[in-house]
Regions:
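Polytopic membrane enzymes that build or remodel cell-surface glycoconjugates and lipids
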Residues: 1-210
């Protein structure tokens, strides 16, 4: 039974990857839109891309402006620029990949909370979690976060926010394994900090745990 469920998870995640890839494949070569011109071409990539490539990071990574408090978000744009300069494909690929991994986190959050919280058998929990993750991945409300490159801050923050929540849940089920529990809580804290460095709204995470 355990092997069957593990295989089912693998098949579903592969199917989820295929669905998301097909859904957003037409947007991978879409041009920059709206604030992308300012955020990527002027504010971030062109100003800090050359310093990133040459290793002269004293300008790009030690000044608050224009990085503000979204250091991780802007750093991801700089890395994109270092690898592909101003070709939109790489930027869109990162956003789509983030959406896929966020959907995976949603799947595991749903699976664990349903199995443990509602005391359902693993097969039923797997079915409900799969539907939940599928609805999340296909929900058109996320299309802006995926297609709009400058909205990556939302996608990154959401991924780390939900990862912090998942890690906290996993840690809470490790009462008899202190070391494992500590490591999951440490991972949760790390993801929480990464979420804040992506978008400031992640500061609500401690309240969400109450």
């Amino acid at each position: 039974m355990g092997i069957y469920l593990n295989n089912s998870k693998t098949v579903f995640l592969a199917l989820l990857l295929l669905i998301i890839s097909l859904l957003y494949s037409s947007t991978l070569h879409a041009p920059f839109n709206y604030d992308d011109e300012v955020v990527i071409k002027h504010e971030t990539a062109q100003q800090f891309g050359s310093s990133f490539i040459t290793g002269k990071t004293e300008v790009g990574f030690t000044t608050i402006y224009p990085f503000r408090y979204r250091h991780l978000f802007y750093s991801s744009l700089v890395l994109n620029y270092a690898l592909g300069e101003l070709h939109p494909f790489g930027y869109h690929l990162v956003n789509t990949t983030l959406h896929f991994f966020t959907s995976i986190v949603i799947f595991f959050i749903a699976f664990i909370t349903i199995e443990k919280g509602l005391s359902l058998n693993r097969k039923d929990a797997l079915s409900i979690a799969s539907i939940t993750a599928l609805f999340f991945s296909l929900n058109p409300v996320h299309s802006e976060t995926v297609n709009y490159i400058s909205a990556r801050a939302v996608g990154m923050s959401s991924f780390f926010y939900l990862s912090a929540f998942l890690s906290f849940i996993l840690g809470s089920f490790r009462e008899r394994k202190p070391l494992s529990r500590f490591l999951f809580y440490l991972l949760s804290l790390t993801c929480f900090l990464a979420s804040i460095l992506s978008k400031e709204t992640a500061l609500t995470f401690p309240i969400a745990l109450l």
